[in-house]
Design a protein with these regions (language model features):
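Non-catalytic, mostly N-terminal accessory regions of nucleic-acid modification and defense proteins
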Residues: 1-76, 135-148
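Short, solvent-exposed loop/helix junctions and linker helices
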Residues: 11, 151, 187-191
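Alpha-helix N-cap/helix-initiation motif
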Residues: 16, 55-58, 112, 182-186
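A short, mixed-charge helix-start or loop-turn motif at secondary-structure junctions
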Residues: 51, 105-106, 179-180
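Conserved S-adenosyl-L-methionine
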Residues: 55-159, 164-168, 173-175
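Mobile active-site "lid"/loop adjacent to the S-adenosyl-L-methionine
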Residues: 163-192, 196
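Helix-to-beta-strand junctions that scaffold the AdoMet/dcAdoMet cofactor pocket
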Residues: 201-202
Length: 202
């Protein structure tokens, strides 16, 4: 049974699963150890997302959507920022894009932020498994109320933020310098996300 996200999962079975994964010979001719382990991790993220349904959207964007967004932006080199980074899929695909085009992973610098603590930890693990260095801040936090990268000017902003959020606003944000084009409507965060993206572009 699919119980990846269930609190009652048997810790002994989980330990055995990790032992099994640890014993896999990561010596593929085509893929390095980090790539194989990363694919295993991505598989479980996908399975977890499927079992959780709509609720999983807070941390998981389908790989096909992520690939399309990255291919459109073509982040060959520079600073890549995702203010609602979920489990870090945008960063993984950006790094894959760079290496697929003859570059090196460190041709891009990765910056992100995630609101949910558990999802922030998923992102850190996802990137660590793949050897991708990233600055996701020292904690999970709200990009609107506590921007962890206030001075960042990125070459690329790539994100799938939570759309149509109605409770994003507070009076503390009224005169925020990010609202160059006017204060976004309090009842819908979409325009706030767009202005947040523009604010962080170089």
């Amino acid at each position: 049974p699919k119980q990846y996200a269930r609190a009652e999962i048997d810790k002994r079975l989980l330990g055995e699963l990790l032992d099994q994964i640890g014993s896999i010979g990561f010596t593929s001719v085509d893929h390095g150890a980090d790539d194989v382990l990363g694919r295993v991790y991505e598989y479980f993220l996908g399975q977890f997302a499927s079992s959780e349904g709509k609720r999983a959207g807070e941390y998981y964007t389908p790989r096909s959507v992520v690939s399309l967004l990255v291919d459109m932006l073509e982040p060959y080199k520079g600073r890549v920022y995702d203010p609602s980074c979920g489990s870090g899929g945008m960063f993984v695909q950006s790094a894959n894009f760079v290496t697929a085009h003859g570059g090196k992973r460190n041709d891009i610098s990765v910056y992100g932020q995630e609101f949910t603590a558990a999802t922030w930890r998923l992102a850190k693990m996802n990137l660590a498994i793949r050897g991708i260095e990233a600055n996701l801040g020292d904690r999970a936090d709200d990009s609107f109320h506590r921007d962890l990268h206030p001075d960042l000017r990125a070459d690329f902003v790539i994100a799938n933020p939570p759309f149509n959020v109605s409770d994003w606003y507070s009076d503390a944000l009224r005169d925020d310098p990010r609202w160059k084009y006017g204060t976004p409507p309090a009842g819908n965060g979409n325009y706030a996300w767009i202005q947040h993206f523009f604010h962080h572009l170089a």
